[in-house]
Amino acid sequence: YDPDLIMFQDDSFLARPEKEVFEFCEMWSKYKIPFWFNTRIENCKPAYLSALKEAGVYRMTFGVESGNEEYRRKVLKRQASNDRYYEYFNYINESNIPYSLNVILGMPFETRQMVIDTADMVHRARGYDGLTIGMFQPYWGTELRTMAVKAGFLDNAYINSGGYMDKWAIDMPEPYLQEDELDKLLRTFALYAHFGPEMHSVIQESETDDKLYKKLFAQYQQEFFGDV
């Protein structure tokens, strides 16, 4: 075999002992086959990034679970602060290693404002060159599914048979996200993330104004992708 690129199917490639990370980079630098992996933002120590570049890393992908620190700690059990994420985004951007971001909207107990908080975090990340926006799906065996069932947001008999953009499965009372809100935010999230807080009111208006939405989306495409 003579692969041009290798994708490591590991949810958090750098969440392993430091010794293993450096041993991998030393070994891989002998071959320099471009590679791509998923990992967590707060695992990207500057020394890791330098070693990965030397080893021939092609790109990285990160999941941004939520930009709302309280929600992330209480519901998602992620203890890193927003400031820590921003610190590590700076390290990642300074490394010049290309990266993309994955976002999931519509999680249990999530509100519209929490989604906007996530968009604002993505906006501050700055250096990403790709953004995938998915819808929460309550897969069997996950804590978030159990949480949704216990809260009465989901029938325990529900089985997801589609992908991450299948129909939204949970039904939450206000003030949590409603289905029509989620549909609008899935459509406009990239705009909120790209243009930032100063454009929030205009983007919110575009959620119900298709002409304005198309104008903003065309501007976003030009600024983000350039002439393609």
Regions found by a protein language model. Give the residues of each.
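Glycine-rich Rossmann NAD(P)(H)-binding loop
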Residues: 9-12
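C-terminal non-catalytic accessory extensions
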Residues: 206-228
